[in-house]
């Protein structure tokens, strides 16, 4: 089995090293095409206004000046001579749950793999932020991901569907199993931090405020809060079929499929 790895935290990220160790429990044929620099929050974006620069680190390790989406395309279309059987994106430093999935470059890696016709998984590890530092328990995903992936790899998923795996912030022995979940809802409360440079010109940082949400049973955020691994099936089709008829009636058309 051929496995292609990517991430959004960059080629030197601890989570990518963890993902490689996870992948090597499944196969010896592991390839990496990951961003040269941190691409967090770039979602499913493409580099269209500048060239992609590929740097070979070793026979199956490459760094790309591009987004996670670019990396998967380059891996499948340029770097690998034979299409991979599996795309793994991650392991992200921090969970990708609720509305996070719309911003996430980690999720985008799995989206692009799915669009390329390859079974794909996104993996993310929740962490504790304490005294201005991230404390990421990588051993949780490394302990539990291999067996989980073994069970899920041969699952007959519909076309256009991939799985989003999130690992809780706890010790490996405290994980209370895995739960199939749906997306929860968290308010991002993004704020703008306005500053001035040395010449008095303004510049801005986006920063996160307090995140609030309803930890409803069955959601990804509820699972993580209760030390469970969340497994959320996501699909590329964003159509809201529940309102198509209402929209059609508002426009004076008949019922839609």
Curated annotation (Swiss-Prot):
Its main location: cytoplasm. Its EC number is 3.1.3.5. InterPro entries: SurE, SurE-like_Pase/nucleotidase, SurE-like_sf. It comes from the Bacteria. GO terms for cellular component: cytoplasm. Binds 1 divalent metal cation per subunit. It catalyses: a ribonucleoside 5'-phosphate + H2O = a ribonucleoside + phosphate. NCBIfam families: PRK00346.1-4, surE. Belongs to the SurE nucleotidase family. Nucleotidase that shows phosphatase activity on nucleoside 5'-monophosphates. This is 5'-nucleotidase SurE. The gene is surE.
